[in-house]
Amino acid sequence: MNNKRALKRGEEGENLVASFLDKDSSYHRLINNLILLGENNVSHQIDHILIRNNGIFVIETKNYYGEIIGNEDDSFWTRSYFVKGKRKSVSFHNPLKQNKSHIKAIKKVIGNSFPIYCFVVFTQNNAEGIDLFNVCGPESLLTRINLITIDKELTKSQIETIEQLLLDNEAYLSSDDHVNKIKEVEKDRKSHQKEIRAAIEKRVCPKCGNKLEIKQDSLCCPK
């Protein structure tokens, strides 16, 4: 699937989930497609943020076809499908972990005083094999959200304040800028890892520059 088709498919999925969230009968605020800057100026494109009396719900939408396979702690999940009678599998980053990084960016803006929940929605209802409460199809999303209770519900004023804080901190980046920022961070990370490996190969501590010593068959910094 080329980038334009993938982008269009993603937008279709996000619009579908937004239409279900708009049906929420409780007092709420819904923010779709918000970009925030997190740690190290990394941009986070968040599909949906639903703010209501029982908390803040950060929702990642995946409009993937094929059978979805994965566990909560896996780094990657897999979607498996057939092409011309042959099974094909493609891995993708665990969306729960992806969404939890978005939550960190949100907490950077609003603090830690409010309950925040992570949900992942597969619009094709093809994640039945993942037995997690916060992974579902769009039809059951609001039902699951309504099951969550908290000791002290958010007031109307708090809901509106949270919404305004998030909107005031929105980073106005194009999709291309967002992708480029991610690429820059990944490039810096790989470059840093390369520098560390090069230092270790020279038996030099990458942190302090001291010569590494061999202790119990391992290289260790004398400091």
Identify the residue ranges that each predicted region occupies.
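A short, glycine/acidic-enriched catalytic loop
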Residues: F76-T78
